[in-house]
Amino acid sequence: MKVAIVHDWLVNYGGAESVVESILKIYPDADIFTLVYDKRKIGKRFQNNIVVTSSLQKLPFATKLYTKLLKFMPKAFESFDFSNYDLVICSSSSCAKGVITPPDVPHIAYVHTPMRYAWDLFFDYRKRSGRLTRFFMDRWMSGIRAWDYISSQRIDTLIANSKYIARRIEKFWKRDSEVIYPPVHLEKFTPVKNPSLDYYVAFSRLVPYKRIDIAVDACKALGKNLVVIGSGSEEKSLKKRASGAKNITFTGRISDEKLCAYLQNCKALIFCAEEDFGIVPLEAQACGRPVIAYGKGGVCETVKDGVTGVFFPEQTASSAREAIERFEALDKKGAFKSETIARHAASFSEERFIREFKAAAKRAQKMVNQRTVHK
């Protein structure tokens, strides 16, 4: 069986690219189609597969400025020819799911999210954009939304990465979807005996929507030790925000081994973003450590309040402070058991993802076969 995997872009490695790697364990000989591909940043991960890029790859600085090419993405993805393939699988948070496939070829879309910047977060993105970007957003986005909806109707099987995203798919595309949680590679994340438990951790790319500022402000006000792990555009402003607070340290980008050690020994992970799913909270839980999280988005499906962590209801520092105090009160009573937390995280393993995805692909193939027979 000849399989194509379509991914929005391969310019860095994150949770979405991890999903592609797991799908490749089911279909190791699949060809990969993508808008643009930066081999230097992706490394050797997909070196054993044919990677086909769009015509946009030829543009200068395409791998750096790909987000500015939204207007041209629909045509780029629709230009890929899948007439010689038996199965097409899309991994999409943007336009990848809009490919056109032959009638007898199953088209499965694993959706990380419908385009945030086209739908419910349009005004947030617009507010943070420069004048020129706003000019084009105001003139192009209605057309992008129309294409996004229309292209979603030609997918045979829609898979959402969480119930939260399934609700967004129903809202914006008027489609039902099944939920298969992303694979979490938990092998290296394990509990340790006698963790130090003398600091909190905030780990992510340091970009605005991750809201690391909330963790910084909350721990600064409470005098709690906080280790901020990661790098990004907000790093300088966050360090300025934490100035004078000796209890807050920044590590920058670190190795997986060091990250694991920090998670294994922390009091808890503080997670302030509204994410579609959020793998980091599960990595912390796999280490047996609880999570203090903003109670909105996919994290509501991966953290059990009062058992594997606590939620705070508002995306503010004051709400996070109250959650930290609540967490510490519960922790003193022995509410959070390392073994229970790690066992909960194990239910999101890669093995589970592969099993569920295989079953979904089998159902998609059967549905398309029945459709072809009836015609």
Outline where the language-model segments fall.
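Active-site donor-binding segments of glycosyltransferases and PAPS-dependent sulfotransferases
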Residues: D29-K97
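A charged, aromatic-enriched C-terminal amphipathic alpha-helix characteristic of glycosyltransferases
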Residues: Q315, K332-N369
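Membrane-proximal helix-turn-helix segments that form the acceptor-binding/catalytic region
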Residues: K127-L158, A166
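Acidic donor-binding loop of glycosyltransferase active sites
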Residues: Q264-D276, R289
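Nucleotide-activated donor-binding/catalytic signature segment of Leloir-type glycosyltransferases, i.e.
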Residues: K236-E257
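Conserved acidic donor-binding segment of nucleotide-sugar-dependent glycosyltransferases
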Residues: D305-G306, V310-A317, E325-K332
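Conserved donor-binding/catalytic core segment of Leloir-type glycosyltransferases
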Residues: V192-K210, V216-V227
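Short hydrophobic beta-strand element within catalytic cores of glycosyltransferases
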Residues: I270, P290-G295, V303
